[in-house]
């Protein structure tokens, strides 16, 4: 047990009291991102080190690892605290998304350390999808680079509103204020093109030396702002899902015996109370909440983010993937949508392709109808393309095999975010964020000849493993 943890437990009056206090602290999920070798892993290591979150055995192991794999000479290589894969240590880079947990007296934190290399942009998008804040590291010697722009855009695309631009390695530019001011101006010029109302803050620091990370730097007296840790402890995170209407995707039908039938899942947004009238989509059947069951017992009310089991007053047909919402809410299922896509596969995404898509607990098939444009990350302009390559970001028009209850991603990431799954390998090949709904709802139905319909029926009957589309079903759906 480290010293600060032992002291905190003693101050709280024992382990049980300390654990209760931890439960009432707010939680901040953030990621570090930026270009290659900007010092992301070193910064996380410095945060853990300076907040005394490293145990004695970890510190001893870090000394040994620094001698074998370190890149800082006689100094501790704090990046090794996070770079856990052997390939990462041998190459001195981050490959996988590494998660670390720590807490201070004011807040709990979950950190996602994401790769800087362009070929691992998909890993970075994975890490950003659950975060509230992004720390964008910039090497003071290099300034704003393409990966800085790419990661900034992906972060905002995935709904992150709080950006902390950490201008690192200030020790290598003699802590000059003019270097900080120039990079700040360059980034603000670029950020004017980013979507949404963003909270952007700038901190000059040295992760290697510890300047302005957890303690104020004596080398940059010209900077009067907060340290990085102070920003993380005090930033006000207003989650949009708390203010959105109630959405409860059913993940599991819980029926341990004949006397109990509940619907388990995580409340995606809003709140739900015992006695509240709810509606089930896609069926539209209504009922009311009889019980809200949790691990700690029954509750009268549950809020967004809580894992609960809902018991209803009526026995109605509900299965995995259905969506529960307030009875007075209207959410029309859609078959067509425009989706912002981050593509993660070697094979490009092209019109005409079909994929399995998973949205909350729902899994269905979708067809790529068109690619409106790909985003040029360097200047955030739109350009016409025939396909979306690996790590490409663009807006895609899709048609689902069945109507889905969807929200716009910026309003509700759970019911507006989806993943693409290759139907042969079952590998996740892309991430999607709903931008527009029913964009092609007024498109006239496609007319198929009798021969085309008969051939389609024959293929579907005798070769079901081909997963051919039901043209007759498409015709009826469009009509």
UniProtKB/Swiss-Prot annotation:
Residues 34-41 are annotated as: G1. Residues 113-116 are annotated as: G3. Transmembrane segments: none annotated. It catalyses: sulfate + ATP + H(+) = adenosine 5'-phosphosulfate + diphosphate. Keywords: ATP-binding, GTP-binding, Nucleotide-binding, Nucleotidyltransferase, Transferase. Residues 168-171 are annotated as: G4. PROSITE patterns: G_TR_1 (PS00301), G_TR_2 (PS51722). Its EC number is 2.7.7.4. GO terms for biological process: hydrogen sulfide biosynthetic process; sulfate assimilation. It holds the Pfam family GTP_EFTU. Heterodimer composed of CysD, the smaller subunit, and CysN. This is Sulfate adenylyltransferase subunit 1. The gene is cysN.
